[in-house]
Amino acid sequence: MSGGLDVLQMKEEDVLKFLAAGTHLGGTNLDFQMEQYVYKRKSDGIYIINLKKTWEKLLLAARAIVAIENPADVCVISSRNTGQRACLKFASGTGATTFAGRFTPGTFTNQIQAAFREPRLLIVTDPRADHQPLTEASYVNIPTIALCNTDSPLRYVDIAIPCNNKGPHSVGLMWWMLAREVLRMRGTISREHPWEVMPDLYFYRDPEEIEKEEQAAAEKAVGKEEFQGEWSAPVADIAQLEVPDWSEGVQVPSVPIQQFPAGIEAATAAAAVVAAKPGPTTEGYSEDWSAQPATEDWSAAPTAQAGDWGGSTAEWS
């Protein structure tokens, strides 16, 4: 459907994406209606899908989707886990309606139930797994688009896109390619610039694998914290260490400091000086204390003899 236009031709980076995701790898069985899309068969029995015809059918499907005026009238369905995330991303990017998970029988035919829908276009991931919506679409004349492998039945399928619909990377890449072409044909994004959305967002991830990756990352982080190589004590930066002064703000009472001799030598020298000084002489002095008169006036001034016991005041000073 490229019509020979260079702008619609498959680019080299698109081919590399197809090869990296394994989109060209079919199954070991071949349906007679899918034989026209097979390039050749490998020695191990796996059929190789012609990527040129895959690209042509991809453009045809994108044109059919763009022809629907209301994007919500396009219904995308995937009952397999590998395509549910891709369907949700496709629906959020293009505005389509999605049924991720189990398809309720009678959604297209039973008008009584609350989940009744009347889409104008149906897109499925696997014709064999999504046979129920394909059968109901045939009852109400809804055109259908399907991602078909080499062994997929083409009954009730109007536009078959040959690709590997088993691998999670291949399914995610095909939905990403389809969403990109739809947005390009609508004029939402430009063909001259690459789309900022990566195909990895459309890939299915097993919850067990995600949990294992998180556990491995946590164990790696714990092991890195425990092993620090040769241990060495950290060098304290004394120059920048600030010691707080706890005496700040504490009122200390002012008590006079008593001066004492410096040591034993000072005390000994003071005693020797006192011993060397002459004391009061008692030679020729024989006072009889009993001969004192009984009527001594104690209020009178003291005699000069009373001050000779300790020497003069100048001698002690």
From Swiss-Prot:
It holds the Pfam family Ribosomal_S2. Residues 278-317 are annotated as: Disordered. Acylated. Acylation may be a prerequisite for conversion of the monomeric 37 kDa laminin receptor precursor (37LRP) to the mature dimeric 67 kDa laminin receptor (67LR), and may provide a mechanism for membrane association. The keyword Cell membrane applies. The record marks 115-116, 133-134 as: Cleavage. GO terms for molecular function: laminin binding; laminin receptor activity; structural constituent of ribosome. Residues 161-180, 205-229, 242-317 are annotated as: Laminin-binding. The keyword Membrane applies. It is found in: Cell membrane; Cytoplasm; Nucleus. [DE]-W-[ST] repeats lie at residues 230-232, 245-247, 288-290, 297-299, 315-317. It comes from the Eukaryota. The modification N-acetylserine is found at residue 2. Gene3D superfamilies: Glucose-6-phosphate isomerase like protein, domain 1 (3.40.50.10490). GO terms for biological process: ribosomal small subunit assembly; translation. PANTHER family: 40S RIBOSOMAL PROTEIN SA. Required for the assembly and/or stability of the 40S ribosomal subunit. Required for the processing of the 20S rRNA-precursor to mature 18S rRNA in a late step of the maturation of 40S ribosomal subunits. Also functions as a cell surface receptor for laminin. Plays a role in cell adhesion to the basement membrane and in the consequent activation of signaling transduction pathways. May play a role in cell fate determination and tissue morphogenesis. This protein appears to have acquired a second function as a laminin receptor specifically in the vertebrate lineage. Belongs to the universal ribosomal protein uS2 family. Monomer (37LRP) and homodimer (67LR). Component of the small ribosomal subunit. Mature ribosomes consist of a small (40S) and a large (60S) subunit. The 40S subunit contains about 33 different proteins and 1 molecule of RNA (18S). The 60S subunit contains about 49 different proteins and 3 molecules of RNA (28S, 5.8S and 5S). Interacts with rps21. Interacts with several laminins including at least lamb1. Interacts with mdk. This is Small ribosomal subunit protein uS2.
